[in-house]
Protein backbone atom coordinates (compact mmCIF):
# COMPACT_ATOMS: atom_id res chain seq x y z
CA UNK A 1 0.00 0.00 0.00
CA UNK A 2 1.79 3.14 -1.20
CA UNK A 3 -1.01 5.71 -1.27
CA UNK A 4 -2.19 8.17 1.37
CA UNK A 5 -5.79 9.32 1.07
CA UNK A 6 -6.93 12.52 2.71
CA UNK A 7 -10.60 13.44 3.08
CA UNK A 8 -11.41 17.14 2.67
CA UNK A 9 -14.24 19.55 2.03
CA UNK A 10 -15.36 19.42 -1.63
CA UNK A 11 -13.81 22.36 -3.47
CA UNK A 12 -10.65 22.36 -1.34
CA UNK A 13 -8.85 19.45 -3.00
CA UNK A 14 -6.08 21.68 -4.40
CA UNK A 15 -5.34 23.18 -0.99
CA UNK A 16 -5.29 19.72 0.58
CA UNK A 17 -2.96 18.48 -2.18
CA UNK A 18 -0.59 21.43 -1.78
CA UNK A 19 -0.47 20.89 1.96
CA UNK A 20 0.28 17.15 1.90
CA UNK A 21 2.96 17.65 -0.77
CA UNK A 22 4.59 20.39 1.30
CA UNK A 23 4.44 18.63 4.66
CA UNK A 24 5.37 15.18 3.35
CA UNK A 25 8.58 16.66 1.92
CA UNK A 26 9.55 17.77 5.43
CA UNK A 27 9.69 14.07 6.31
CA UNK A 28 11.61 13.25 3.12
CA UNK A 29 8.55 11.58 1.63
CA UNK A 30 7.96 12.37 -2.02
CA UNK A 31 5.27 11.45 -4.49
CA UNK A 32 2.56 12.88 -6.70
CA UNK A 33 -1.03 13.86 -6.07
CA UNK A 34 -4.16 12.76 -7.87
CA UNK A 35 -6.83 15.44 -7.60
CA UNK A 36 -10.38 15.50 -8.91
CA UNK A 37 -12.27 18.75 -8.36
CA UNK A 38 -15.14 18.59 -5.87
CA UNK A 39 -14.48 14.92 -5.12
CA UNK A 40 -13.96 15.44 -1.38
CA UNK A 41 -10.68 13.54 -1.23
CA UNK A 42 -7.07 13.58 -2.45
CA UNK A 43 -4.75 10.67 -3.26
CA UNK A 44 -1.03 11.16 -2.54
CA UNK A 45 0.95 8.36 -4.19
CA UNK A 46 4.38 7.82 -2.65
CA UNK A 47 7.36 6.93 -4.85
CA UNK A 48 8.70 4.56 -2.18
CA UNK A 49 6.37 1.74 -1.16
CA UNK A 50 7.01 1.92 2.60
CA UNK A 51 6.75 5.72 2.78
CA UNK A 52 2.95 5.83 2.97
CA UNK A 53 2.84 3.94 6.25
CA UNK A 54 5.74 5.98 7.63
CA UNK A 55 4.04 9.22 6.67
CA UNK A 56 0.76 8.51 8.48
CA UNK A 57 2.78 7.51 11.55
CA UNK A 58 5.20 10.43 11.63
CA UNK A 59 3.26 13.40 10.21
CA UNK A 60 1.02 14.58 13.08
CA UNK A 61 -2.56 14.61 11.84
CA UNK A 62 -3.29 17.70 13.93
CA UNK A 63 -0.76 19.63 11.81
CA UNK A 64 -2.90 19.18 8.69
CA UNK A 65 -5.26 22.09 8.14
CA UNK A 66 -7.34 20.95 5.19
CA UNK A 67 -7.50 17.18 5.82
CA UNK A 68 -10.44 15.68 7.71
CA UNK A 69 -8.93 12.20 7.74
CA UNK A 70 -5.66 10.53 6.74
CA UNK A 71 -5.20 6.86 5.84
CA UNK A 72 -2.96 4.48 3.88
CA UNK A 73 -4.53 2.48 1.06
CA UNK A 74 -3.77 0.33 -1.95
CA UNK A 75 -5.07 0.39 -5.51
CA UNK A 76 -8.69 1.31 -6.15
CA UNK A 77 -10.90 -1.78 -6.19
CA UNK A 78 -13.14 -1.44 -9.23
CA UNK A 79 -16.28 -3.27 -10.30
CA UNK A 80 -16.68 -5.34 -7.16
CA UNK A 81 -18.98 -8.27 -8.02
CA UNK A 82 -22.43 -7.67 -6.48
CA UNK A 83 -22.63 -11.30 -5.41
CA UNK A 84 -19.35 -11.07 -3.43
CA UNK A 85 -17.93 -7.65 -2.61
CA UNK A 86 -16.34 -8.89 0.59
CA UNK A 87 -13.64 -11.28 -0.69
CA UNK A 88 -11.61 -8.64 -2.62
CA UNK A 89 -11.68 -6.30 0.41
CA UNK A 90 -10.54 -9.03 2.80
CA UNK A 91 -7.84 -9.98 0.30
CA UNK A 92 -6.57 -6.40 0.16
CA UNK A 93 -6.04 -6.41 3.94
CA UNK A 94 -4.73 -9.95 4.37
CA UNK A 95 -1.08 -9.91 5.35
CA UNK A 96 -1.17 -6.12 5.74
CA UNK A 97 -3.11 -5.67 8.96
CA UNK A 98 -3.96 -7.81 11.97
CA UNK A 99 -6.14 -7.20 15.01
CA UNK A 100 -7.52 -3.83 13.96
CA UNK A 101 -9.77 -2.17 16.49
CA UNK A 102 -12.50 -0.61 14.36
CA UNK A 103 -14.10 -0.71 10.91
CA UNK A 104 -15.45 2.38 9.12
CA UNK A 105 -17.20 2.01 5.76
CA UNK A 106 -17.32 5.59 4.49
CA UNK A 107 -17.96 7.85 1.52
CA UNK A 108 -16.61 11.28 0.53
CA UNK A 109 -18.66 14.26 1.72
CA UNK A 110 -20.41 14.92 -1.60
CA UNK A 111 -24.09 14.84 -2.54
CA UNK A 112 -23.43 12.07 -5.07
CA UNK A 113 -21.56 9.88 -2.60
CA UNK A 114 -24.13 10.34 0.15
CA UNK A 115 -26.51 8.23 -1.94
CA UNK A 116 -24.23 5.30 -1.00
CA UNK A 117 -24.60 5.85 2.74
CA UNK A 118 -27.52 3.44 3.15
CA UNK A 119 -25.56 0.72 1.35
CA UNK A 120 -22.48 1.40 3.52
CA UNK A 121 -24.46 0.97 6.73
CA UNK A 122 -25.87 -2.36 5.57
CA UNK A 123 -22.58 -3.59 4.11
CA UNK A 124 -20.68 -2.87 7.32
CA UNK A 125 -22.34 -5.77 9.17
CA UNK A 126 -21.29 -8.70 6.92
CA UNK A 127 -17.90 -7.11 6.18
CA UNK A 128 -17.19 -6.75 9.89
CA UNK A 129 -18.05 -10.41 10.44
CA UNK A 130 -15.75 -11.53 7.61
CA UNK A 131 -12.85 -9.42 8.86
CA UNK A 132 -13.26 -10.85 12.36
CA UNK A 133 -13.40 -14.37 10.99
CA UNK A 134 -10.09 -13.76 9.21
CA UNK A 135 -8.59 -12.20 12.37
CA UNK A 136 -8.02 -8.90 10.63
CA UNK A 137 -10.47 -7.20 13.01
CA UNK A 138 -10.79 -7.82 16.75
CA UNK A 139 -14.02 -9.29 18.10
CA UNK A 140 -14.55 -6.14 20.18
CA UNK A 141 -13.74 -2.56 19.21
CA UNK A 142 -10.47 -1.33 20.71
CA UNK A 143 -9.56 2.35 20.53
CA UNK A 144 -5.81 1.76 20.77
CA UNK A 145 -5.63 -0.40 17.62
CA UNK A 146 -5.57 0.71 13.95
CA UNK A 147 -8.80 1.63 12.16
CA UNK A 148 -9.83 -0.07 8.91
CA UNK A 149 -11.27 2.32 6.32
CA UNK A 150 -13.28 1.28 3.27
CA UNK A 151 -14.00 4.39 1.20
CA UNK A 152 -16.65 3.92 -1.49
CA UNK A 153 -16.27 6.60 -4.16
CA UNK A 154 -18.88 5.05 -6.48
CA UNK A 155 -21.07 1.93 -6.53
CA UNK A 156 -18.76 -1.08 -6.60
CA UNK A 157 -15.58 1.06 -6.35
CA UNK A 158 -13.67 1.56 -3.13
CA UNK A 159 -10.30 2.25 -1.57
CA UNK A 160 -9.32 -0.06 1.29
CA UNK A 161 -6.79 0.92 3.92
CA UNK A 162 -6.11 1.85 7.51
CA UNK A 163 -5.17 4.67 9.86
CA UNK A 164 -3.54 4.74 13.28
CA UNK A 165 -5.89 5.59 16.12
CA UNK A 166 -3.30 7.81 17.81
CA UNK A 167 -2.85 9.90 14.66
CA UNK A 168 -6.19 10.22 12.90
CA UNK A 169 -9.60 11.79 13.26
CA UNK A 170 -11.73 9.84 15.75
CA UNK A 171 -14.87 10.79 13.84
CA UNK A 172 -16.65 8.80 11.13
CA UNK A 173 -15.78 10.42 7.77
CA UNK A 174 -13.71 12.87 9.82
CA UNK A 175 -16.86 14.80 10.71
CA UNK A 176 -18.08 15.43 14.30
CA UNK A 177 -21.82 14.81 14.52
CA UNK A 178 -23.18 17.89 16.27
CA UNK A 179 -26.80 18.86 16.74
CA UNK A 180 -27.86 22.48 16.33
CA UNK A 181 -29.29 23.73 19.65
CA UNK A 182 -32.81 25.08 19.11
CA UNK A 183 -32.19 28.04 21.44
CA UNK A 184 -28.90 29.16 19.83
CA UNK A 185 -29.01 32.61 18.15
CA UNK A 186 -27.28 31.43 14.94
CA UNK A 187 -25.86 28.34 13.24
CA UNK A 188 -22.34 29.73 13.68
CA UNK A 189 -22.51 28.29 17.19
CA UNK A 190 -21.61 24.89 15.73
CA UNK A 191 -18.26 26.23 14.50
CA UNK A 192 -17.07 26.98 18.02
CA UNK A 193 -18.50 23.76 19.42
CA UNK A 194 -16.67 21.76 16.75
CA UNK A 195 -13.49 23.73 17.45
CA UNK A 196 -13.64 22.72 21.12
CA UNK A 197 -13.99 19.06 20.10
CA UNK A 198 -11.07 19.29 17.67
CA UNK A 199 -8.62 21.44 19.62
CA UNK A 200 -9.26 20.60 23.29
CA UNK A 201 -8.84 16.96 24.41
CA UNK A 202 -11.96 15.64 26.11
CA UNK A 203 -10.09 14.82 29.32
CA UNK A 204 -9.04 18.48 29.63
CA UNK A 205 -12.48 20.06 29.21
CA UNK A 206 -13.08 20.46 32.95
CA UNK A 207 -9.78 22.31 33.32
CA UNK A 208 -9.85 24.42 30.15
CA UNK A 209 -13.59 24.82 29.50
CA UNK A 210 -14.85 24.87 33.05
CA UNK A 211 -17.59 26.90 34.70
CA UNK A 212 -16.71 30.24 36.24
CA UNK A 213 -14.10 31.17 33.64
CA UNK A 214 -14.07 34.58 31.99
CA UNK A 215 -14.12 34.92 28.20
CA UNK A 216 -14.25 37.60 25.51
CA UNK A 217 -16.12 37.24 22.21
CA UNK A 218 -15.05 39.80 19.58
CA UNK A 219 -17.64 40.41 16.87
CA UNK A 220 -20.16 38.61 19.01
CA UNK A 221 -23.58 39.55 17.63
CA UNK A 222 -26.08 37.98 17.59
CA UNK A 223 -24.29 35.57 19.92
CA UNK A 224 -23.68 32.21 18.25
CA UNK A 225 -20.21 31.84 19.76
CA UNK A 226 -21.17 33.53 23.02
CA UNK A 227 -23.88 30.87 23.37
CA UNK A 228 -21.25 28.11 23.58
CA UNK A 229 -19.38 29.97 26.31
CA UNK A 230 -22.53 30.70 28.29
CA UNK A 231 -23.60 27.05 27.96
CA UNK A 232 -20.36 26.13 29.73
CA UNK A 233 -21.21 28.53 32.58
CA UNK A 234 -18.58 31.12 31.67
CA UNK A 235 -18.89 34.86 32.17
CA UNK A 236 -18.60 36.55 28.78
CA UNK A 237 -17.67 40.03 27.57
CA UNK A 238 -19.47 40.22 24.21
CA UNK A 239 -17.96 42.94 22.01
CA UNK A 240 -19.97 44.18 19.01
CA UNK A 241 -21.74 47.35 17.91
CA UNK A 242 -24.79 45.27 17.00
CA UNK A 243 -27.45 43.79 19.26
CA UNK A 244 -27.08 40.58 21.24
CA UNK A 245 -29.83 37.97 21.46
CA UNK A 246 -32.07 38.81 24.46
CA UNK A 247 -31.99 35.16 25.55
CA UNK A 248 -28.25 35.45 26.19
CA UNK A 249 -28.49 38.79 27.99
CA UNK A 250 -31.20 37.34 30.24
CA UNK A 251 -28.75 34.75 31.62
CA UNK A 252 -26.85 37.41 33.54
CA UNK A 253 -23.60 35.89 32.28
CA UNK A 254 -23.03 38.35 29.41
CA UNK A 255 -21.75 41.92 29.51
CA UNK A 256 -22.33 43.61 26.16
CA UNK A 257 -19.71 46.16 25.08
CA UNK A 258 -20.81 48.19 22.05
CA UNK A 259 -17.29 48.77 20.76
CA UNK A 260 -14.87 48.02 17.94
CA UNK A 261 -13.48 44.51 18.36
CA UNK A 262 -10.07 45.59 17.09
CA UNK A 263 -9.74 48.29 19.75
CA UNK A 264 -11.34 46.61 22.73
CA UNK A 265 -9.10 45.75 25.68
CA UNK A 266 -10.18 43.59 28.63
CA UNK A 267 -11.32 45.55 31.68
CA UNK A 268 -9.60 43.09 34.05
CA UNK A 269 -6.69 40.67 33.90
CA UNK A 270 -8.82 37.54 34.37
CA UNK A 271 -9.70 36.42 30.83
CA UNK A 272 -8.98 32.80 29.91
CA UNK A 273 -10.64 32.49 26.49
CA UNK A 274 -10.73 34.90 23.57
CA UNK A 275 -12.90 33.91 20.60
CA UNK A 276 -13.33 35.89 17.40
CA UNK A 277 -15.35 35.43 14.22
CA UNK A 278 -15.00 38.83 12.54
CA UNK A 279 -15.10 39.35 8.77
CA UNK A 280 -11.81 41.13 8.11
CA UNK A 281 -8.52 40.63 6.28
CA UNK A 282 -6.71 37.59 7.72
CA UNK A 283 -3.49 39.45 8.59
CA UNK A 284 -5.41 42.09 10.55
CA UNK A 285 -7.22 39.44 12.59
CA UNK A 286 -4.03 37.44 13.15
CA UNK A 287 -2.13 40.47 14.40
CA UNK A 288 -4.90 41.38 16.83
CA UNK A 289 -5.01 37.84 18.19
CA UNK A 290 -1.24 38.02 18.64
CA UNK A 291 -1.66 41.29 20.57
CA UNK A 292 -3.93 39.55 23.08
CA UNK A 293 -1.54 36.67 23.62
CA UNK A 294 1.59 38.83 23.76
CA UNK A 295 0.01 41.22 26.26
CA UNK A 296 -1.13 38.33 28.44
CA UNK A 297 -4.78 39.39 28.11
CA UNK A 298 -5.88 35.76 27.65
CA UNK A 299 -4.51 32.23 27.71
CA UNK A 300 -6.22 30.63 24.72
CA UNK A 301 -7.74 31.98 21.51
CA UNK A 302 -9.95 30.50 18.83
CA UNK A 303 -10.53 32.62 15.76
CA UNK A 304 -11.58 32.35 12.14
CA UNK A 305 -9.61 33.52 9.13
CA UNK A 306 -11.66 34.31 6.02
CA UNK A 307 -9.81 32.96 2.98
CA UNK A 308 -9.36 34.57 -0.44
CA UNK A 309 -10.60 32.85 -3.59
CA UNK A 310 -7.06 32.09 -4.78
CA UNK A 311 -3.83 30.95 -3.07
CA UNK A 312 -5.71 29.87 0.02
CA UNK A 313 -3.03 27.49 1.29
CA UNK A 314 -0.41 30.21 0.93
CA UNK A 315 -2.63 32.63 2.87
CA UNK A 316 -3.00 30.10 5.67
CA UNK A 317 0.72 29.36 5.95
CA UNK A 318 1.61 33.06 5.93
CA UNK A 319 -0.80 33.89 8.75
CA UNK A 320 0.18 30.93 10.91
CA UNK A 321 3.83 31.90 10.44
CA UNK A 322 2.99 35.51 11.33
CA UNK A 323 1.31 34.46 14.56
CA UNK A 324 4.20 32.17 15.51
CA UNK A 325 6.72 34.91 14.73
CA UNK A 326 4.94 37.46 16.91
CA UNK A 327 4.89 35.05 19.86
CA UNK A 328 8.49 33.89 19.39
CA UNK A 329 9.74 37.49 19.25
CA UNK A 330 8.22 38.05 22.68
CA UNK A 331 9.70 34.91 24.23
CA UNK A 332 6.35 33.19 24.67
CA UNK A 333 5.83 29.43 24.81
CA UNK A 334 2.85 28.49 22.68
CA UNK A 335 0.91 25.91 20.69
CA UNK A 336 -0.82 26.72 17.40
CA UNK A 337 -3.19 24.48 15.48
CA UNK A 338 -5.55 25.22 12.62
CA UNK A 339 -8.29 23.26 10.89
CA UNK A 340 -10.74 23.66 8.06
CA UNK A 341 -13.67 22.49 10.15
CA UNK A 342 -16.77 20.78 8.81
CA UNK A 343 -18.83 23.85 9.78
CA UNK A 344 -16.35 26.24 8.15
CA UNK A 345 -16.88 27.35 4.57
CA UNK A 346 -14.44 29.79 2.93
CA UNK A 347 -12.49 30.08 6.18
CA UNK A 348 -10.35 28.15 8.60
CA UNK A 349 -10.38 28.06 12.39
CA UNK A 350 -7.19 28.68 14.36
CA UNK A 351 -6.45 27.77 17.96
CA UNK A 352 -3.50 29.22 19.84
CA UNK A 353 -2.61 28.54 23.44
CA UNK A 354 -0.14 30.40 25.56
CA UNK A 355 1.82 27.96 27.72
CA UNK A 356 2.21 29.72 31.04
CA UNK A 357 5.32 28.66 32.89
CA UNK A 358 8.64 29.75 34.25
CA UNK A 359 10.46 31.77 31.60
CA UNK A 360 13.68 33.56 32.62
CA UNK A 361 13.09 37.24 33.12
CA UNK A 362 9.29 36.98 33.06
CA UNK A 363 6.56 36.36 35.53
CA UNK A 364 4.12 34.15 33.62
CA UNK A 365 2.28 32.65 36.58
CA UNK A 366 -1.12 34.00 37.38
Curated annotation (Swiss-Prot):
Family matches, as Pfam families: FtsJ, RlmM_FDX, RLMM_N
Domain of life per record: Bacteria
SS bond partners: none
Signal peptide positions on this chain: none
Active-site positions on this chain: 306
Keyword Transferase: yes
GO MF terms held by the record: S-adenosylmethionine-dependent methyltransferase activity
Binding residues annotated for S-adenosyl-L-methionine, in chain numbering: 188, 221-224, 240, 260, 277
Localisation: Cytoplasm
GO cellular component entries: cytoplasm
EC number(s) on file: 2.1.1.186
Example of a GO biological process term: rRNA processing
Purpose: Catalyzes the 2'-O-methylation at nucleotide C2498 in 23S rRNA.
Subunit composition and interactions: Monomer.
Family membership: Belongs to the class I-like SAM-binding methyltransferase superfamily. RNA methyltransferase RlmE family. RlmM subfamily.
The protein, known as: Ribosomal RNA large subunit methyltransferase M
Protein's gene: rlmM
